[in-house]
């Protein structure tokens, strides 16, 4: 648990330094900062760092790869399709802030590195570690879901407004429960990221709309697309490493 919580603390600190303090996600013109935030805080610390912790814990026999969300390729393909489908439904049912296709592509690409890191750190690392530490109690998945969701909410204090308030922490903890339900039932990291990213997309686009900068996302932003592609590659590489 100490190692898992250390990863969480380092990731939250990096998030504040590269996103929360400079208000990166509210500044569409800050392409360099967005790339730095995506690469350092999310890819290196969140995905790669979190993945290495999962690999370490599985090698020590403290948890299984499947329990952390790294099952078979077939499970992953099915879960990812379900994650995209359910995520799209939830996005539409909430009254989407935008249906502009380019805005959706840019927004999805912008939040993907963040969503991947959130799922890796809060659920694959901390959630799985909590569940393993409470076994063989039947309530272990419930306890893990509650802890992971609460930490997901608290982590947003390191973000830009309007996410860095205790009201948002409470609301996002409830959102985290939906992600917990998807992960602990489906046990797949890729599907959970797809579902979670759709939830994050709604929140980020709404915040951009309230800030009056959503229109700037109507042109494809190549740095965002590149960071999303790198994120997918990193997730697949870490998944292969854990299962090797």
At which residue positions do the language-model features occur?
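Juxtamembrane cytosolic interface motif at the C-terminal end of transmembrane helices
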Residues: 52, 90-94, 235-242
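Alpha-helical transmembrane segments of multi-pass integral membrane proteins
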Residues: 6-12, 75-94, 111-118, 144-155
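Transmembrane helix-loop-helix hairpins at the membrane interface
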Residues: 108-243
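Membrane-interface helix-boundary motifs at transmembrane edges
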Residues: 61-71, 130-139
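Loop-to-transmembrane helix junctions at the membrane interface
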Residues: 66-73, 189-194
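Helix-boundary and loop/linker segments of multi-pass membrane transporters
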Residues: 69, 95-105, 137-139
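Juxtamembrane "helix-exit" motif on the non-cytosolic side of transmembrane helices
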Residues: 17-28, 89-102, 155-162, 205-212
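Alpha-helical transmembrane segments in multi-pass membrane proteins
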Residues: 1-58, 72-82, 105-110, 218-227
